[in-house]
Amino acid sequence: MAKAKFERTKPHCNIGTIGHVDHGKTTLTAAITKTLHERLGTGEAVAFENIDKAPEERERGITISTAHVEYETEKRHYAHVDCPGHADYVKNMITGAAQMDAGILVVAATDGVMAQTREHILLARQVGVPYIVVFMNKCDMVDDPELLELVDMEIRELLNEYGFPGDDTPIIQGSALKALEDPNSEWGDKILELMHTIDEYVPDPERDTDKPFLMPVEDVFSITGRGTVATGRVERGVLHVNEEVEIVGIHEDIRKVVVTGIEMFRKLLDEAQPGDNIGALLRGVQRDEIQRGQVLCKPGSITPHHKFTAQVYVLTKDEGGRHTPFFNNYRPQFYFRTTDVTGVCELPAGTEMCMPGDNVEMTVELIHNVAMEQGLRFAIREGGRTVGSGAVATIIE
């Protein structure tokens, strides 16, 4: 059967359900697809069973089960991720396997805020999920409006505590199960209200081409009489010939240079776009003044740092990780973009050691600078073997 062509007519947004186990994340995901399909005639309804038995994927050596569904509102096309298990969420968010432009936090009105509700909000904050919209589920099982109000307050306080705008965050009350049973009921209206709220509250994500230019340097060579060429894959933004860029990373100082030519597959280009594997000819740069591990970027868009806090997932033995815990002052390699940098891990006060399978916040000090920003992903390696995965949470220096 021929595959349908993906029509890019609407803005695209990546979204996902987060929240405590059994609060109804997967039921809500199914209810959204069914309600939008029946009420707006968009997309396809995906059954609960098909979301729940998500296939295992391997992302950077880590086994993650994730279900991907898509749906559309009148305004946008959404790609939605839902994970069956709590550990899958932790891995997913930290590895950036599924980058989210926004999260739908599902909280059961019958339980209120639970342990994983808290952990998922913390993770969302640490890895840089910019927006959260709340769906208070199972409201059909709560008769007391005062109880709903208490849960509402509890959620807002928690969001504030982790640096989200709790007072202004939309909270939609509904029942995913009732909406799934009858999308045309008032419970179905609540699903439409949720999606309309997400359309309005979450701004259109910035496209990769609109972001400031960045290309990690993979290789460097010199062409006699022409200068030095840095090669790599454009991560974001657009580069034009004769534009000025900065060389950032490894050293304290930042060097400005002009790109006098761009090549791809031995052909000359006027501009390079995200995903292009290019060679950038740099004016007046010596072969030894730029190296793998640095980046070329739009001037002023990213700065070099060596000390930061990070949210880290430690691989289990089965995932090919360590068989034993590690302790404070552990010194592995941190793999950023194209290169390994040695660093020292400082565990949180009161944490003696870190076991395989743990998710931990740590402070890291690298032996030299890396072009860094919040949300940047990295791998932790020992002798070329990946033993952990992380995201930069805050930059210290």
Swiss-Prot record:
Record's GO cellular component terms: cytosol
Keyword Oxidoreductase among record annotations: no
Amino-acid positions noted as binding Mg(2+) in the UniProt annotation, renumbered to this chain: T26
Keywords assigned: Cytoplasm, Elongation factor, GTP-binding, Hydrolase, Magnesium, Metal-binding, Nucleotide-binding, Protein biosynthesis
Phosphoprotein found in the keyword field: no
InterPro entries given in the database record: EF-Tu_GTP-bd, EF-Tu_GTPase, EFTu-like_2, EFTU_2, G_TR_CS, P-loop_NTPase, Small_GTP-bd, T_Tr_GTP-bd_dom
Listed name of the protein: Elongation factor Tu
Organism listed in the record: Lachnospira eligens (strain ATCC 27750 / DSM 3376 / VPI C15-48 / C15-B4) (Eubacterium eligens)
Gene name of this polypeptide: tuf
